[in-house]
Structures are given as C-alpha cells and as structure tokens.
C-alpha cells in the first residue's frame, strides 16, 4: 500500500479524545483520513504534527478510533476496496456494490459517495 503524509493539529487530537470520552462517533471523510487516524491512534503516545503512514488495513484489522467513513466507490480488488471491506465487512460491501452497479452509480474518484459504518 502506498504511503501518505498528513498533519494533525493538537486541537484535532483533543476534539477526538473528547468525543470518544463522551461516547461520540468519529467519522472519517475519505480513506486518507481513516488511515491517518488509525495510524495515529495505534501509537502508544499520540503527538500532533506532520506524519506519514503506510498502514495497510485489511480484513482482520481491529479499528481503534474511526466509527464511520464517507468515501467514494473504489475499484474492486484494489487496496482501498480491501480497506472498506475490512471496515464494514466483505458481505456488506459486496451487497452495496451490487446495488451501486444495478442503479448505475458512478465509481472512482469523481463518482458517487457512500457512507459506511464499522461492522
């Protein structure tokens, strides 16, 4: 899986910790944000700043922080489809994609979006 750079300000870390302490949900807008947050919160000590992740999320991964994801429809058999399948379950994603194809949703970067919750 490719690596991605990201920056997380102190304020964001505080907001996430506050939301989680109140049983709030964390919603990632895009797979880059999901990978960044899961990578950041897998560290023993969480620090703000510029970071890089090459985390490869696949079925069996235990999600630590993200509860829901807004993302586009990814290519089947791609690493990002594997990520969303790990997040919401392979069967759920297969049904979702069958529905999207049947209803002529647009795929890829400039296509339709989907909101999925962690299984």
What are these regions (language model features)?
Residues 1-119:
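Surface-exposed, charge/polar-rich loops and edge strands
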């Amino acid at each position: 899986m490719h690596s991605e750079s990201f920056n997380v300000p102190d304020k964001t870390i505080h907001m996430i910790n506050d939301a989680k302490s109140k049983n709030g949900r964390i919603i990632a807008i895009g797979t880059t944000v999901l990978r960044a947050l899961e990578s950041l919160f897998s560290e023993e000590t969480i620090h703000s700043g510029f970071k890089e992740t090459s985390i490869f999320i696949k079925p069996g991964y235990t999600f630590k922080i993200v509860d829901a994801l807004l993302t586009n429809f990814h290519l089947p058999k791609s690493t990002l489809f594997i990520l969303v399948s790990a997040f919401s379950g392979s069967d759920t994603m297969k049904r979702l994609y069958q529905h999207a194809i049947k209803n002529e949703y647009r795929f890829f970067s400039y296509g339709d979006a989907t909101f999925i919750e962690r299984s």
